Amino acid sequence: MKIAVIGSGISGLSAAYYLSKNHKVDLFEKDNHFGGHSHTLDLNLNNKKISVDIGFIVFNYKTYPNLINFFKDNSIEIEKSNMSFSVSVKDTNFEYCGKGISGMFSNKSNIFNLKFLNMFFDLIKFYKKNNNLTIYDNNLTLGDYLTKEKLSKEFTDYHIIPMVAAIWSMPPYEASQMPLSFFLKFFQNHGLFKLKNRPQWYTVKNRSRTYVNKILNKISGEHYKNYKINLIKRHKENIEIFYGEKNEFFIYDKVVIATHADEALSILEKPTDEEK
């Protein structure tokens, strides 16, 4: 079959890779680089070139078994990574690193800082309570829950909301609006509520473009970047995908949409109730 995969993040790349074993697969990406969140930049610091991933960061063996197997299938090297979190509040002496007691009290004045101690003890209470919590109100947002639990402003503003905002790359207001159920499941599954014995995290050796380029070379068809898909029309015998300012189109037997759900819905002609 002739198949189109729309979106070149990890979902699109892996789908295109496995389908390429038996089919002709073309890959479409709306941006000027392949990889989605996996985006490596080269920086020159003090006349030294360093490569930095600005999206793809880390994974572990427990939570990402399919990704681990995907990397093994393609002989992609990985290495241990340090996943850490720190906060420094501008124009104050309020700062800490989240890695252990020594990190929390790396600023020795924190021992005598009442606001910091409020945050610290709320952190311990919050993590212990929510590590195995399974019964909660599905209608609550994270912000609602923090208010309901009467947690300190310091814990809310200088710890949990900044951490959520950092993990999902969103502003603090949006972090507070996150559904409580999603937040709890993610933190529980990733061991982020554990005060000790957290999982070992890993990253791709030589940065994420290493795996992106390797997978691109194994895709059976063409790679199209800067191709924004406008519309997908489904017919009985085939599927048309329209792209670009001139609304030109390709014809395929099957199409895999590997984008965010809202993007997928916006390009589907006549989506079904189930798809909505």
Describe the function of each predicted region:
Residues 234, 241-276:
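Central helical "cap/lid" subdomain
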Residues 20-44:
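Glycine-rich FAD pyrophosphate-binding loop
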Residues 11, 33, 262:
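Conserved Rossmann-like nucleotide-cofactor binding loop
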Residues 41-67:
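N-terminal glycine-rich dinucleotide-binding loop that anchors FAD/FMN and/or NAD(P) in oxidoreductases
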Residues 51, 79, 222-224, 250:
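General small-molecule cofactor/ligand-binding pocket signal
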Residues 183-242:
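Helical element adjacent to the flavin cofactor pocket in flavoenzyme catalytic cores
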